[in-house]
Amino acid sequence: MQGTVESQGTAIAVDHAHEHPDFRVLGLLVFLISESLMFGGLFAAYLLLRGMHEQWPPEGTEVELFVPTINTLILISSSFVIHYGDVAIKKDDVRGMRKWYWITAAMGAVFLGGQVYEYLTLGYGLRTNVFANCFYVMTGFHGLHVFIGILLILGVIWRSRRPGHYNAQKHTGVAMAEIYWHFVDVIWIILFTLLYILTRF
């Protein structure tokens, strides 16, 4: 009789949990939608300014492709790497998740390092002309998001040190970091196309 009551209590608790889903992922998605609108505004303004100028970018503010292309490959690859971490935690492999998330954070740091190197070697600054202004604002805003993404990943790694904090059934924080990182990746692909590819052809 007692076992039956306990089983019923467990079932009720499970049903109750299903009635109250974790809204953190939904909150993240709403945040990313708002960020997408901000980036969309920047993209629209950039394209409008480009259409108003016969020569784009203006002479003396050309961009190089070598470092940004390497950076792009690193960031795209990191999206696959972080996904391996999500796969690992779904198999209750916390150590594997940590490994892949460490690698992702390192790749993000290398990306930022490449971005800083590019800034130092471009030969023009934020106020040189309208293209330079767009370039620094857009890539800098994206770089800020990459930095935030690295912090989120490191936060997941830190919290995973607590036994049982993440497992195959409870890994919302891991999933949120992955979703955010994929968002950062997609935004960069658009930026790379606008600022580097389309300005060379």
Curated annotation (Swiss-Prot):
Pfam families: COX3
Catalysed reaction equations from the record: 4 Fe(II)-[cytochrome c] + O2 + 8 H(+)(in) = 4 Fe(III)-[cytochrome c] + 2 H2O + 4 H(+)(out)
Membrane-spanning intervals of the chain: 25-45, 65-85, 100-120, 137-157
UniProt-annotated location(s): Cell membrane
Keywords, comma-separated and alphabetical: Cell membrane, Membrane, Translocase, Transmembrane, Transmembrane helix
GO MF entry, a single one: cytochrome-c oxidase activity
Annotated EC: 7.1.1.9
GO terms under biological process: aerobic electron transport chain
GO cellular component, one term: plasma membrane
UniProt cross-references to PANTHER family, sorted A to Z: CYTOCHROME BO(3) UBIQUINOL OXIDASE SUBUNIT 3 (PTHR11403:SF2), CYTOCHROME C OXIDASE SUBUNIT III (PTHR11403)
Protein name: Cytochrome c oxidase subunit 3
